[in-house]
Amino acid sequence: MPTYNQLVRFGRKSKTRKTKSPALESNPFKSGVCLVVKTVTPKKPNSALRKIATVRLSNKRTVNAYIPGEKHSVKEHDRVLVRGGQVPDLPGVKYHIVLGAYDIAGVKGRKQGRSRYGTPRKQVAVTKK
């Protein structure tokens, strides 16, 4: 417990919160160039081959970003848009690639949750009477 005099001299320090995606520098998205596309295995007890890409962001930082969805069109030297968001079972992967932006196509054949996977709305044929 501080004394009254200590509070007058130093005041109360407010705690600073640590950001979960420091490479974005308080921006919602950052663009970058894909350097490597690879698969990694998740932590126990899960088992899979998760697709990730190493991306050099526009602020010269290099991050590992997760590629969501089934099948992807991410290749080396593609321009990508990166957002924050951790992958729970992949240590060190704190970012997601936004599908349907820049050089990356959306997931084909998706009917629900299309906006998350960059899938365009299916065109309905209109018949004239």
Swiss-Prot record:
Residues 10-20 have a biased composition (Basic residues). CDD domains: Ribosomal_S12. GO terms for molecular function: rRNA binding; structural constituent of ribosome; tRNA binding. Keywords: Methylation, Ribonucleoprotein, Ribosomal protein, RNA-binding, rRNA-binding, tRNA-binding. SUPFAM superfamilies: Nucleic acid-binding proteins. The keyword Ribosomal protein applies. One of its GO terms (cellular component) is small ribosomal subunit. Residues 1-25, 109-129 are annotated as: Disordered. GO terms for biological process: translation. The keyword rRNA-binding applies. It comes from the Bacteria. The modification 3-methylthioaspartic acid is found at D89. Belongs to the universal ribosomal protein uS12 family. Part of the 30S ribosomal subunit. Contacts proteins S8 and S17. May interact with IF1 in the 30S initiation complex. PANTHER family: 30S RIBOSOMAL PROTEIN S12 FAMILY MEMBER (PTHR11652). With S4 and S5 plays an important role in translational accuracy. This is Small ribosomal subunit protein uS12.
